[in-house]
Amino acid sequence: MPHSFGAYLILYIMVDLFNYTRRASSVAHIGAIDLGGDNPIRIQSMTTTNTNDTEACVRQAEEIIKAGGELVRFTTQGSREAENMKNINAGIRADGYQTPLVADVHFNPNVADVAALYCEKVRVNPGNYVDPARKFIKQEYTDEEYAHELQKIEDRFVPFLNICKEHHTAIRIGVNHGSLSDRIRNRYGDTPEGIVESCLEFLRICKKENFHDVVISIKSSNTVVMVRSMRLLVEEMEKEGMNYPLHLGVTEAGEGEDGRIKSAVGIGALLADGIGDTVRVSLSEEPAAEIPVARHLVDYIGKKKGHLMIPATACPSFDWLRPTRRETVAVGNIGGNNVPVVISNRINGESTVCENKDATPDYIYIGGKMPKQFVPGQSYIVDYNVYETLNSKPETTGAKLYPIFPAMAMPLIASIKADVKFLTLQFGTPAEEYIACLKAHPEVVVICVSNHQNRLGDQRALVHEMMNAGLKNPVVFAEMYQHGKEEKSDFQLEAAADMGALMIDGLTDGIWLMNNGDIPAQTIDETAFGILQAARLRTSRTEYISCPGCGRTLYDLRETIAKIKEATKHLKGLKIGIMGCIVNGPGEMADAD
């Protein structure tokens, strides 16, 4: 009988939502390096050169290595390419590099057998290793027929494992959401359960054959599917006594700022919960450009290590595996069934006129200062002690003003009349006091802040405390950073990583990004909207699901992406798939329009 997910509620194992610790995994030996266990989180990339072009492959691989890549992957679509990995390996070793090389195999298990002779690791895709190419047809399998298909996989996979054992070659079981087999899709649907079962079918064979140099990946262009699937995989492996190391990545993330933000939302959400042993940030750019992005993301999350314990209690109704949006009462346009709002910080006298109409914040915080101009129809947040004064000025006519209170001013909330009020809270605020206040004032929106070393755990803690108290006030997460405009990419990666798990957990009714530096307010606002779109919570621009390219790509992918973007960037809300080959193309384009 195929594996069932029906008992997950009973066997459900919860990670520590509040205190960072890295998941304990087994160690995979991959050539000169070890992956998993107590080893550093490894950074890797993939070449885009023709694998039959030895010189070009060696050159690009060494660019990746010099940038800090610890593993380099090559596409091996046929036996000829797999055979040439011998020459590529020799060329790189002759230049003094011992970096492990990985062969990427699809559709043909015979190619994997050859690649295992010349590479330190071979990636196989369960969706097309033995199962026939997808035809997207409906076909019902009896349990006996299904078991027969599983036996076919084992009969072909075990000889490959034996070759790997003989040559000390590691493997990656790499499942892609876009290339699930028809067999899996027909039984489990296009779901995280199907994605995970596709992986487990191969892992059970590895375990049975005592083959332990295994790494696993589950990838999707949809960050929510990717994170939920990986969480479920961790849970299911735990049940079956497996703890293989995990490779993280958001496939077809795209390029530029959007690609970085989408990758950071998905990868960051998992790393922040201690999940992940190696990372590849898939960007439609030069492969070496992926390395510093992945490195910054890993190093940033690593700063959580050794933080002061957060003594919080998870809400019993919260489901980490299948989270739904926290139930809240709508306060104005915040919470309830509304999309998450964006609040912009303009306390330094900046103009509150927003030039990018697709990234116009829902609320602008101006503190206690008069801006150069109040925009009619725009909503402003002002400090509670100047709210009534500013609200009575003729300059504010046509604008909407709302007060914000620090925690110490809670007793004054009742004395000020407003349809929407904001209250800044951090975990550790005396619970009895703020809970009583919020119960008495359903018109209050909580601004959740944190200066804790592990701000994700700290902010989760406050919301879970509210949930345990039965509070339904909306919550906006406020995050402060310190970057100059030359560090814009770092700011975007950090903000997306911090917000990733909070959004996928269903806790987010709004986002307020702040920066103590000279990054323009418009850039910060655009980042906030980009993060919400990456988490599939709010669409504000055209979305491009574009792969990074590899040796299978037979055209100039980056030039094509640029042309498509220029022609379609005005089509707000449209998701456009741009694929370099057929491996994931049809499946990942199912997520596009």
List the model feature ranges, each with a label.
Residues 52-63, 108-112, 263-267, 350-356, ...:
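Short, acidic/polar
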